[in-house]
Structures are given as C-alpha cells and as structure tokens.
Amino acid sequence: MAAALRAPTQQVFVAFEDVAIYFSQEEWELLDEMQRLLYRDVMLENFAVMASLGCWCGAVDEGTPSAESVSVEELSQGRTPKADTSTDKSHPCEICTPVLRDILQMIELHASPCGQKLYLGGASRDFWMSSNLHQLQKLDNGEKLFKVDGDQASFMMNCRFHVSGKPFTFGEVGRDFSATSGLLQHQVTPTIERPHSRIRHLRVPTGRKPLKYTESRKSFREKSVFIQHQRADSGERPYKCSECGKSFSQSSGFLRHRKAHGRTRTHECSECGKSFSRKTHLTQHQRVHTGERPYDCSECGKSFRQVSVLIQHQRVHTGERPYECSECGKSFSHSTNLYRHRSAHTSTRPYECSECGKSFSHSTNLFRHWRVHTGVRPYECSECGKAFSCNIYLIHHQRFHTGERPYVCSECGKSFGQKSVLIQHQRVHTGERPYECSECGKVFSQSSGLFRHRRAHTKTKPYECSECEKSFSCKTDLIRHQTVHTGERPYECSVCGKSFIRKTHLIRHQTVHTNERPYECDECGKSYSQSSALLQHRRVHTGERPYECRECGKSFTRKNHLIQHKTVHTGERPYECSECGKSFSQSSGLLRHRRVHVQ
C-alpha cells in the first residue's frame, strides 16, 4: 500500500471516549433487541482494539500492571478490572474504563448459558470477545466464527491485533497495516464473506449462509444485514431526519446523524475556528491547513488526506466496480454513484427549489442550483478572476490556462480536459448511441441531445428573445438568433474578410477559397464541399421530399424551403426594411429590396 502506511511513525494515542457512541433514553427505546446486542458487541470490540494497542488512552506507567484479562462482568458491576503483571507495563486508565462501564450499565444484558467476558491475550495480544452461543450454531462445518475456550463460552475472533510498531495482519487476507485507521477501514478481499470496512463485519469464509437475496445473489448470516442489503439495492431510505431532511437506509446511521445535531463540538481548529465533536475529525480537518497527505497510491504516487479516499482511488487502477445496479447491470466504483444512478430508473426528484420549482434527485444538486438564484460564486480563478459556483467548474476552467489535457483517446490520440468529454468523443469511434427517445425511437450519443430532442415532441420552447419575443427550444439557438438584432458577426474569414454569425458558416465558406470538394455523389459524380450539401443533392436522384407542409400537403427537399413556404399560410413577414418599413416573408426578398435604396 502507500509508503506512508509502511513507514514507522510516532504513535498517536486515542482514548476510548473518542470512539464511543452514546444514546439517550429516547434513542435507546427506538432500538430493537438485535440492534442493542450489536451495539454492545461493537463497543466491546472497540474497547478491545484500544487495549490491544497498549495503554487505552496513551497513559503509560512502568509500575502498573498490564490488562491481560478484563472481565466485562466486573466492569458492568462497577468493580475495578483485575490485571496480571506483564512486562508490557500498560494499564487500564481512569478515562477509558469508566466510559465502557457507563455504556455497559445502560445495556440490558440478556441471560444466557454463556458468561459475558472479554479477554486480552498474552504476548501476542490475541483478541478474545464474548458473544451469544446461538451465533456459533449458525456454522455447521469448517472453521468457526468464534472459538470456545474450555468451560467459558468466550470466543476468539479470527484475526490478530499486535502492539504498535508491528504490522496489523489479517490471517486470512495476509495484508499488513501500520496504522489502526488503515486496519479499521481496510476493504477485505473476496476471501472474506462480507467486504465491509469495519471490524464488526468480518466473517470467516466458511459455514452456511442461510439468507439469500435473489437480486444480487448474495447471502447473509443475519436477517438484519439481509434487510439492510435489500434497501441498498432498492435505494430505500426510510429513516429521515426532521432537522435537515437527510435520509438513511439504516436506523443506526440515522441515530448517529441525529446525535450530530445535539452533540457538543469541543474540538476547535486553531486555524479557522471550525469545531468538531470528535478529535479524530479535527485531526483530519487540520490536514486541509497543513497540506499533509500521508496516504500515497503505490501505482501513480497520488496522495490523499484520508485512507478511505485512497481505497476508493485504487479502484481506478484495479478497475474494480463492486456496486452493481439491479435494474440494468451497470456497475460503479463508489456506492454514492450507484445511488445517484438509481434515480434514473425511479425518476424520483424529491428535492424541489422553492424559487423556481425545479426538482432534483439529490440534495447536493439542489444546493448547487440555489447558487443560480443567490448569485454566489465562491470559487475564483487566481489567473483571470473568473468565479464559479462549483469547485469542479473551476478545476475544468483552470486547464484552459495550464493547457492540461489529461484524458487521451486511445484510438486517435486526441486529448481532452474533461473525462466526460473524452467519453462522448469515444462514441465517434464506437458509434454508440445509448440515449433513445421513447416517443420516436431516435437515438443520440449524448444525453443533452436527447433532452433537446424531447422538446420537439412536447413543443416546449423555454428560451424567448427579449427583442422580438420569438422562442426557441435550445439556448444556443436563442444566442444565434440574437445576432440578427445585434448584427454581430464574430467569425471572419482571414482570406477575404467576410464575416459570419456562426463558426460552421465560416468553415463552409473557407472551402470556396481552397476549392476543396471532398464529398462526391456516387450517382453522377458531382462533388460538394459539405456533407449536408451532398445529402440534399442525393434527393434529386431519390426523389425524396421529407419536409411536408401540414396545411396544404406540399413537400420540400430542404427544411428551410418548408419554413419559407409556411409564411404563405401565416402571412408572417418578419423581415422589415429599416429605410421604408416595407416587410418581407423571406430574407432574400429583403436583400433584393435594399438594393433599391442603394441605387
């Protein structure tokens, strides 16, 4: 992994209080029995991990004993834990132990044939954890999830934790980490049953898994995890926060989030004054100011502030896309991308703008949209001062100054500043047109093309000219039209000086000087400078007249001929002479008339 993870670093001590989660009485009532048991196990695991790293909060005393065997029963009964003497000279401190004791007193411990004990092993500090005996019965053969220790119904987890200075190793995976956060956030390889990122989700790859989910063909040992996975595939988020509107698929995530509203933020950044409820969050935030990026990618050398972001980045190199859509089979490297994609199938847009009524499938999109109304553009270019509403727009813009084009087409070598533009370009080579109109079946290579095309069916023309009130279905068409009023012709021919409203018109004109006519008719051999001209010419041979007037049924080979013809029925005369006020139905008529005044 990253060099920063392999290099020996100074140990940073974290107290158990920093990772403990508290519930109020009201919140506790919302949890079912399985969730309470799960909460207890997680707290015990976190406590054991803290202890396995040496002193539980960093206090070291050479005269104190080591925490070799701590009984949860003793903690829950308010007694000081017993400890055997060891050369490690670490001790349970006065901070961590009371925190765990308070938590255990809150939990309703269910009577069972097995005793509830937590052990911290000898020199290798094996991680021993208590559990319910019925969990053991779920495994019929192979290596068990927990190992029974004599008469005590305590079980050993199938992984080892070593003291700081030695690598943390998963026996099944064989992957080493020199930082606790790296271990806790490690995405376990497919040899482990569930590839989740926290220790409490680890499972040995043997034994029966009775609950099967037909959508993704995955199986689970616990029904609660099975239900949670179903929500992940369906996109269901039934738990909604009444404070901010954020929704969650799991009650545990919802409860953690609710505590964030009422949590005291005691850890303040000395640089900007921003405060955090946890010291670990403050440490991560401070890297924004220091510029520290301790996690390096071994493939490309790119560095990151958080190990979780590094793990996500590495999927770029491995090509791993573990999150698959059950509707269309499309897969994604991040779960957030899959969640966004699902809205394309459901077409749900729950986030509506109170100003204009426009709706969005994600709250972040609504937040960005608000800046259209407020005019806030917080991201400014240091080169030219141009400001943007989104950081990604600024990044794309800065490439105009640097000339950076990191995305290269493997077919023709053409490079682009944005990955999305490269993807669109590659469809020129593949011929892919993935966006199909449900009305007429016409296909497009870009979603924007389909979106504009749909307006032809709905007759929607949202872009109106402020000069003549003529409306258009596309903004680009409106911009082009406005040059009729302004007289602006920004595209000038370098050979003859003739100027044009559109760049495409200039390109077509330049073929007059070069005499280039690459498009030849295979019927009569006549050649043209433009492909569109050849297409129109072929209709002479085929007799095709695709543009028909709905009023009289007359048909035409060109669309502009049909538009001109329609003025016969409407009586419209949009072209007016500025000299005498005479109007015409066609621009050519106005041009001929102007010669009268010139003469």
Curated annotation (Swiss-Prot):
GO function terms (MF aspect): DNA-binding transcription factor activity, RNA polymerase II-specific; RNA polymerase II cis-regulatory region sequence-specific DNA binding; zinc ion binding
User: Subcellular localization, per the record?
Assistant: Nucleus
Q: Give the main localization category.
A: nucleus
Report the Gene3D superfamilies cross-referenced here: 6.10.140.140, Classic Zinc Finger
CDD domains linked: KRAB_A-box (cd07765)
Q: Which GO terms describe its cellular component?
A: nucleus
Zn-finger (C2H2-type) intervals are: 239-261, 267-289, 295-317, 323-345, 351-373, 379-401, 407-429, 435-457, 463-485, 491-513, 519-541, 547-569, 575-597
Looking at the keywords, is Protein biosynthesis present?
A: no
Pfam families assigned to the protein according to its UniProt record, in alphabetical order: KRAB, zf-C2H2
Enumerate the Gene Ontology biological process terms: regulation of transcription by RNA polymerase II
Question: Which InterPro entries does this entry report, sorted A to Z?
Answer: KRAB, KRAB_dom_sf, Znf_C2H2_sf, Znf_C2H2_type
Q: Where is the KRAB domain?
A: 14-94
Map out region (Disordered) in residue numbers: 68-88
Q: Which UniProt keywords apply?
A: DNA-binding, Metal-binding, Nucleus, Repeat, Transcription, Transcription regulation, Zinc, Zinc-finger
**Stated role:** May be involved in transcriptional regulation.
Which family does this protein fall into?
Answer: Belongs to the krueppel C2H2-type zinc-finger protein family.
What's this protein's name? Zinc finger protein 530
Species in which this protein is naturally found: Homo sapiens (Human)
Q: What is the lineage of its organism?
A: Eukaryota, Metazoa, Chordata, Craniata, Vertebrata
Q: Which gene encodes it?
A: ZNF530
